[in-house]
Regions:
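Terminal, regulation- and interaction-focused segments at domain boundaries
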Residues: 1-18
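Conserved small/polar residues in nucleotide/adenosyl-binding loops
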Residues: 94-100
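N-terminal intrinsically disordered, cationic/polar leader segments
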Residues: 4-6, 24, 32
Length: 104
């Protein structure tokens, strides 16, 4: 059948979780790492904050829901066949949690 992963990440900066363009770009990058076939993308910005992105895939789906006020993001990935949802989760996690600025 396939593999289903749920990922919840906490303590993510508000600005990273309330930017619909950044969330969508991150999710697209994530599915591209496994050469998954995107069928449709839907992104919605909630008022006053929060973003949901849904990506329909030929191999199944990816969804991302953010709660910036709580610093939380939930990502749901299901892939059929030999595609690896773990690498999709890894890219999503890395892009959403790395600091935007670093001082050395």
């Amino acid at each position: 059948m396939g593999t289903h992963l749920l990922l919840e990440v906490y303590n993510v900066p508000f600005e990273k979780l309330n930017d619909p363009q950044k969330i969508e770009e991150t999710m697209v990058k994530a599915v591209e790492t496994e050469d998954l076939t995107i069928l449709n993308i839907f992104t919605h910005q909630f008022d006053p904050y929060g973003v949901t992105t849904l990506i329909s895939l030929a191999e199944s789906h990816l969804s991302c829901h953010t709660w910036p006020e709580k610093g939380c993001v939930a990502i749901d990935i299901f892939t059929c066949g030999s595609k690896n949802p773990r690498s999709v989760a890894s890219v999503s996690y890395t892009h959403l949690t790395l600091p935007t600025n670093r001082e050395v």
